[in-house]
Structures are given as C-alpha cells and as structure tokens.
Amino acid sequence: MELVRRLMPLTLLILSCLAELTMAEAEGNASCTVSLGGANMAETHKAMILQLNPSENCTWTIERPENKSIRIIFSYVQLDPDGSCESENIKVFDGTSSNGPLLGQVCSKNDYVPVFESSSSTLTFQIVTDSARIQRTVFVFYYFFSPNISIPNCGGYLDTLEGSFTSPNYPKPHPELAYCVWHIQVEKDYKIKLNFKEIFLEIDKQCKFDFLAIYDGPSTNSGLIGQVCGRVTPTFESSSNSLTVVLSTDYANSYRGFSASYTSIYAENINTTSLTCSSDRMRVIISKSYLEAFNSNGNNLQLKDPTCRPKLSNVVEFSVPLNGCGTIRKVEDQSITYTNIITFSASSTSEVITRQKQLQIIVKCEMGHNSTVEIIYITEDDVIQSQNALGKYNTSMALFESNSFEKTILESPYYVDLNQTLFVQVSLHTSDPNLVVFLDTCRASPTSDFASPTYDLIKSGCSRDETCKVYPLFGHYGRFQFNAFKFLRSMSSVYLQCKVLICDSSDHQSRCNQGCVSRSKRDISSYKWKTDSIIGPIRLKRDRSASGNSGFQHETHAEETPNQPFNSVHLFSFMVLALNVVTVATITVRHFVNQRADYKYQKLQNY
C-alpha cells in the first residue's frame, strides 16, 4: 500500500499529460514541422502537398549553402473561398524570416498562378488560416536556380500582328525546371487570338506539375484566362492588344511541350478609315460599312502593287511594308516619308463612261521627332479627307555576351563582375534597309528615371569613358562596349539610356556619317528622326551575394506558433512523461530489491 500511495501522484501526472495530447490531436491542428529541403547540396528541388487545418499559423524557411536563387510556385491553392485575404493567406518573404521584404501574398481571391523568386539563397513563406472548418489544400513546389544561366528559346517578346512560338526543344521533350514567359503585344485597337496546335504536358486534374498559364494582359498580374496541361488544343482570345503566356515545368515526366500560333483581330468599330504607322509598316483599316457605298466588300481594293492583297475579317486591313508593295520613300528637309495609294474602281459595262464613284486613298507616314506622324488622304469625287495620329519609333537595347553580338543576355537584373566588359546594342526594328542608326548620347544612372547622378559614356557621338569603345555604323544597329563600374554611396544598380539618330544611309553629309563631333559643331535640332532606349538594372555580383546569408546555412525549420500541436508545451510534456516512467521503473526495482535483501551479494572479507 505504501508503494501505491507513492506512485499515485506520478500516475495522475502521466494520465494528465496523455489527456492533453489526446485533446490536441482531436482538435485537428496540422503539424508545422514539415521538413523542407535545401541544406543538402544534392537537393535542388522539392514538391509537397499541404493539408491545412483551421486556425493555422505556420512559417517555413528554405535555405541553401550556395549562391543560388529560389523560385517557389503555388500551382494549386484551395483556401477558404469565403475568407478574407487578411484572415487567411500565404505570404512569401525574401530572406530568412517573416521580417524580410514581402515578395507577395496569396489568398482565395487571387486570379493568377503565384510564382515568387528570391534575391538570394533564402526564402520564407507563412500560411495563416481562419477558423472555418473546410478542406484546404496547397501544392508547393520550389527549386534552386542560377539567374545568370538561361534556357534557349525560353520566353521572349512578340510584337507582330501574327506569329508562332513553341516550348524549348520542341518537338523533343521540354527541359526540366523551366519557367518561360512570352509577352505578346500587337498594335492598338487589336485583340489577340491564340491557338495551340499541340499541347503535350504531364496530365494532372489540377495541372499542378507541368502547365501553361495564359493571362489577359501584358503581365502575369493581368488576370488568368486559363491554366492547361495534358493533351488539349484550346483557343484563347484577349480583351486588349496584349497577352502573356507562361510555361512552368517540374523535375520529372518531360514530354513534347507545345506549339502555338496567334493572329490579330481588329477590335474597334470605325466609320471610315484609320491609319497606323510603325517602324516597319503602315497599317490601314477600312470599315466594310464604308465600302458598301461602292458596292464592294474589299476584294477589289489594291495598293500600287496589285499583288499585295488585303486581309478580310470584320474590317478590310492592309499591312503595307515600308520597303514593298509600291511604297515610295522620300527624303526632304531632314525628314523621311513613306507613301502608298489604295485604289478601287467598280466594274463598268462601258469603257468610256461610268456612273460609279471612284475611290482613292493616299496613305503617308512621316518620321517625326521621337515619333512617327501619320497622315491619310481620302479622295472621293474630288472630296479630300484627312486624319492625323502619332506613334513612336520601335527601337530596343540589349546586352550581349561578346563582341560578336550573337547571343542576347536575357537576365534581369544582370549580375556582373566589377570591370567586366559589357557589350551593348541598340536595334531599330524596321523593314526599310536604307536607314542607319547612330549613337549620339549614352549615359548611366543608378535609378531608372535618370535623375542625378548620371555618368556619360558617349556624348555627341564621342566616347567619354576611357573603357568605352563605339563601333562603326552598322545598318539598323548601334553598338558599343564598356567596362562595368559601380556608383558610389552603395548604389547597387546601373541603368543605361541611349539617344540615337536615324539617318538615310545614302546621305553622306548626314549627322550619322560625321561621327564624333564637338559640342560647338554639332547641330541635330533639325533632325526629326531621333529616339532613345533604356536597359537595366545591371548589378555587381558581390552586391547580390551580400544580400544573402554568409556562413553555413542551417537545416530548414518551422517557426513555433501557439497553434502547433508539437510546440514547446507538448515537447515539455513528453519530457516529463519520459522522466516519470524512468522514475517509476527505478522505484519499482528498488522496492523489489529491498524485499529480497537476503539474496544480496556481499563483499568478501580479505584474509
């Protein structure tokens, strides 16, 4: 009885601990101690399905002892549809804790596939749920990647009225761990019709693994039209003149990928005729209702070159190249103009007289100051109508890997070593072969608005930096190189801006052919065709590594919260339970030993 009396308090304590653990399990709080990979150098990716419970608050940190970035994708998110973004969400932070910069937030109201990228080798995400008792499922997939390594043909910019593109390696298996973004943008007043000729991606009901995401606008924040995978051939139509397509793949089951094409559909209703000028063509839109007065549906309309035919849809559309279809190019008073004529004459039973209206549409594009001026003349029985509009030159600037200017660098931001040679090219996108690009001024700035401070690399066509080399005139391309530098006062980014002149290549007296000219001699005010391009940011590699953690990265862990069933209180309970078991066992053994003391071994006396 004495033994029972002594053991009773310990027994009650053990039962109390067990009851506490049983109650915690009955409440259904999910464990936040999911083991995320990353500390192991051999592990480059991880996927997991999280089954979340009410009143959850969990935080995970992904780390890797290597200078790589992390891309995390939430390809399937099922949260409380009635919950607010404040009470139930997923937050992603750049760094080792939730105190780092917020990369973004995910909730049930989001209309996109959430994808986030860290600036260094650490990333943290936190999941908070409300008290509603519903099913919640989140598929999380992340992997480590090097921003300075790109996959060929993975994404790009498409700006023609029609075109096609495919997944990398198509029709061979697509690459693993790929994230490709294609931006499609056509001229104003058009919509985009996207048609997938083939899609062969991993089949999954929720498209969690390999998928295509189509967005109705210029970015992945524009609104999701569809997320597809498997073996389907869907068609999508934008509501504006831009569309974004994303391909995301995981680490297994690579198939053929996809093949897609797109066309443009004129979206606006017009009463007569409109004209749009770009760097390589004139685009004329004629209303079919306007042509009804001529008993025509557009089939009898033609340019100066009758072999150039219009495209017939809900409107009649002419795409007139600046160097074809009979377009006349003229240089006068430091100005370049392009002119063509659209004519129509109804068939007549007599070769002498006609009682039908005659139609002649004169279209003219004039290159102006940092823009193109569009003029259209319509003559109908000696009545002339005119319309004016404004556009801009189509120029772009890019970095290249070498002085061969063959392989473009697509990373942004682009991380470089101090004093590394950078190769820059400004391109004029036009079909006119008789134009040449001249680099007038190029400068650098630590900010994208080019406020103070700025640093001149090229001015008046002359190199202002000892490492800067300007290449000779080369058609539609202006090229130069310089060595990477950093602005003082810890400004990590560098942006480049170039102002260029566009000249007639046959004019040997043009400013472009004069090369480097001192300020007192230069005069470009009369030049109407000039424009500028911007690229950036460029950052030093040491700035990138400094933003991450130094030293050995510890194992990925979960922060402890009050809602975790295996928090410090429960851990302490387990320790008490184990200690009590050991104590009970010790007392029991000692009790039985004391009861049989006569069988003890005794030390023999020495003789």
UniProtKB/Swiss-Prot annotation:
Disulfide bonds join 17-58, 85-107, 154-180, 207-229, 442-498. Glycans are attached at residues 29, 57, 67, 394, 419. It is found in: Zymogen granule membrane. This is CUB and zona pellucida-like domain-containing protein 1. The keyword Repeat applies. One of its GO terms (biological process) is trypsinogen activation. It is a single-pass type I membrane protein. The chain crosses the membrane at residues 569-589. Residues 25-568 are lumenal. Residues 25-146, 154-265 form the CUB domain. Residues 1-24 form the signal peptide. Residues 276-519 form the ZP domain. CDD domains: CUB (cd00041). Localized to zymogen granules, where it functions in trypsinogen activation. May indirectly regulate cell motility, cell-cell and cell/extracellular matrix interactions. Keywords: Cell adhesion, Cell cycle, Cell division, Cytoplasmic vesicle, Disulfide bond, Glycoprotein, Membrane, Repeat, Signal, Transmembrane, Transmembrane helix. Pfam families: CUB, Zona_pellucida, ZP-N. The keyword Nuclease does not apply. Detected in pancreas and epithelium of ovary. Expressed at higher levels in ovarian tumors than in normal tissue. Residues 590-607 are cytoplasmic. One of its GO terms (cellular component) is extracellular space.
